[in-house]
């Protein structure tokens, strides 16, 4: 069995702990987003520890699975329906399934966030 997301680590039988800094480092949104980091897929959930480079915007995109984004370091801004929302460490963004959105990091340093999606689809979405 292979991971739904190209390059992601697939959790196997008996695997219970993952060093997210050492699992396969992949692009979080090839062709539309500059984020990258470690990604692990289970049977029903996908988790990733991502780094969003400072000064880099994403293009508008969507994905058929819902997503949670928990900011650990730096600041992240996300746009939904023309309105921008900002969150720093401890803030959590919710992205409904199929919701077109975009993000940016206008801070002076990278943003690090933990993200979780249901595994009905892979980590990657599609450019809007």
Report residues per predicted region.
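A short, N-terminal "cap"/entry segment at the start of jelly-roll beta-barrel domains
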Residues: 1-44, 126-128
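Conserved GNAT-family N-acetyltransferase fold
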Residues: 50, 69, 93
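Short beta-strand His + acidic residue motifs that chelate non-heme Fe in jelly-roll/DSBH
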Residues: 58-60, 78-79, 95, 101-107
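Conserved short histidine dyad/triad with adjacent acidic residue
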Residues: 33, 48-62
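Glycine- and acidic-residue-biased ligand/ion/polar-headgroup-sensing regions
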Residues: 65-76, 81
């Amino acid at each position: 069995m292979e991971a739904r997301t190209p390059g992601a680590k697939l959790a196997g039988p008996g695997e219970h702990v993952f060093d997210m800094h050492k699992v396969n480092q992949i692009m979080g949104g090839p062709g539309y987003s500059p984020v990258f980091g470690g990604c692990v897929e289970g049977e029903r959930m996908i988790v990733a520890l991502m780094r969003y480079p400072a000064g880099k915007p994403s293009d508008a995109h969507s994905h058929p699975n819902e997503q949670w984004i928990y900011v650990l370091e730096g600041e992240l801004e996300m746009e939904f329906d023309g309105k921008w929302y900002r969150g720093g460490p401890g803030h959590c963004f919710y992205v409904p399934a199929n919701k077109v959105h975009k993000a940016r990091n206008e801070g002076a340093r990278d943003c690090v966030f933990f993200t979780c999606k249901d595994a009905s689809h892979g980590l990657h979405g599609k450019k809007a």
